[in-house]
Design a protein with these regions (language model features):
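Pre-ATPase regulatory/linker segments immediately N-terminal to the P-loop/RecA-like helicase/translocase core
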Residues: 1-3
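Conserved helicase motor core of SF1/SF2 NTP-dependent helicases
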Residues: 5-32, 36-146, 150-235
């Protein structure tokens, strides 16, 4: 049964989205991600495979299709370093700005300018906040992007998934090689959660797993070489 949930968004203007030279693997991802029966996609891949870019692109397309009202970008506030920076001065927005930069960068790349990205934020068509703010919320008609999910616990991922209401679509993105949390298993909660939802029953409920490999790295040939070398080394 196809999802017929349609957003009555008072903002009628279409978003002009830059079209990039997508690979066949990326087009395959779009076919799954944008399918009306798809609800959740666990996306695995090393650095440089454009996981955030592709999910953001899908969110923008879904807004143009009037299937969602807005994009919500979430991350766990975990630093990508073995040493914490400790207390940082400033407002909550100031402190979270650096965690949100990957999403803002992808928005600007797809929209063509910082001004156009800011306009979407002003119209409340995009929002960004940490995972621990999600509890108690109910998300209907939204595209949820949980980025760097290898740094999320099972409880955090469960919290995000169980916020989903009618008409929402969720992308859970992770690179298990880049786990920065110390208090859970080596790969955080993502690997366990994605395995739980990798069966036929999950597919019947619109829950998919999609994997990019080092062969799909687009950032640079150097990064592709580095990731391939690290994979072979077993480090």
């Amino acid at each position: 049964i196809q999802n017929e949930f349609v957003i009555e968004n008072p903002i009628k203007r279409l978003i002009k989205i830059n079209q990039l030279p997508w690979t066949e693997k990326q087009k395959e991802f779009f076919r799954i991600a944008l399918h009306p029966d798809t609800n959740i996609v666990f996306v695995t891949g090393p650095a440089g495979t454009a996981k955030t870019l592709l999910s953001t692109y899908c969110g923008l397309q879904l807004m143009n299709m009037k299937l969602i009202s807005d994009i919500m970008y979430l991350r766990s506030a975990v630093e990508s370093s073995d040493q914490s920076l400790g207390f940082l001065p400033g407002t909550a927005d100031d402190k979270l700005k650096f965690f949100n930069m990957p999403f803002v960068d992808k928005l600007e790349e797809l929209l063509g300018s910082e001004k156009r990205a800011e306009k979407l934020s002003e119209e409340k068509r995009v929002s960004m906040f940490p995972v621990n703010f999600a509890r108690g919320m109910n998300w209907s008609g939204k595209c949820i992007i949980l980025d760097e999910a290898q740094n999320s616990t099972i409880k955090e991922i469960t919290t995000v998934l169980t916020r989903m209401g009618k008409g929402s679509k969720c992308f859970i993105l992770a690179d298990p090689m880049q786990t920065d949390i110390r208090h859970e298993a080596k790969h955080g909660g993502f690997v366990k959660m994605s395995k739980v939802f990798s069966d036929e029953e999950s597919l019947e409920h619109g829950v998919y797993n999609f994997e990019f490999t080092h062969e799909d790295i687009m950032r640079s040939e150097l990064v592709k070489f580095l990731i391939g070398k690290l994979n072979k080394s077993g480090l």
